């Protein structure tokens, strides 16, 4: 009944209502593959320390490792997780809370960093969703089409991580420079399409 408050508000409503042991997210323009949940739940059974499992949106992104651990130190430089690919233990919501409803862009990066600061996060080397009804990623449509605002959101996430003592000042500076370079690269790619 709440007026459209954006993706974080919608996700938080779902998180607040969730009762199960695991929580999975699904964006409106994505579709889970039929074996997504089964594949990801089996990962939790392999290692009780795992609290968060992501998957791939594209078979072309597959790598040699079946499972790749993604520590916070990696997540600072690249968001490996697309929201519709993730599943995590319910306990995470109790411990870290909800998505930041004041952040409209790159809000999942903030949430995933907060998770990775406390939990073991892994990436399953398997496509688990049909992403965005075929859209081509950043700069194409939806919120991610606004590259400038997405970059501001990413820089906000890095500032948050530094202020929370998740990362050192050195890591913060390197991550900001790297993020800005990625931003200019994205602009170039979009202009050349």
Enumerate the predicted regions with their spans:
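Conserved nucleotide-sugar donor-binding catalytic segment
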Residues: 16, 55, 69-149
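Catalytic core of nucleotide-sugar-dependent glycosyltransferases
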Residues: 131, 142-168
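Short aromatic/hydrophobic "clamp" motif used to bind/position activated sugar donors
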Residues: 23
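Conserved donor NDP-sugar-binding/catalytic core segment of glycosyltransferases
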Residues: 35-65
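Active-site acidic Asp-centered loop
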Residues: 26-28, 54
């Amino acid at each position: 009944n709440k007026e459209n408050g954006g993706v974080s508000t919608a996700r938080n409503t779902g998180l607040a209502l969730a009762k199960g042991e695991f929580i999975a997210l699904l964006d409106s323009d994505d579709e889970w593959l039929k074996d997504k949940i089964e594949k990801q739940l089996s990962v939790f059974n392999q290692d009780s320390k795992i609290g968060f499992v992501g998957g791939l949106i594209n078979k072309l992104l597959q790598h040699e490792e079946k499972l790749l651990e993604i520590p916070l130190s990696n997540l600072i430089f690249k968001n490996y997780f697309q929201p519709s690919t993730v599943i995590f233990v319910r306990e995470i919501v109790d411990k870290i809370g909800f998505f930041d409803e004041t952040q409209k862009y790159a809000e999942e990066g903030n949430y995933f960093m907060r998770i990775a600061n406390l939990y073991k996060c892994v990436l399953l080397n398997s496509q688990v969703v049909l992403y965005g009804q075929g859209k081509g990623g950043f700069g194409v449509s939806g919120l991610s089409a606004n590259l400038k605002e997405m970059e501001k959101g990413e820089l906000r996430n890095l500032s948050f991580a530094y202020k929370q003592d998740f990362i050192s000042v050195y890591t913060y500076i390197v991550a900001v420079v790297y993020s800005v370079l990625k931003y200019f690269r994205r602009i170039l790619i979009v202009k050349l399409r």
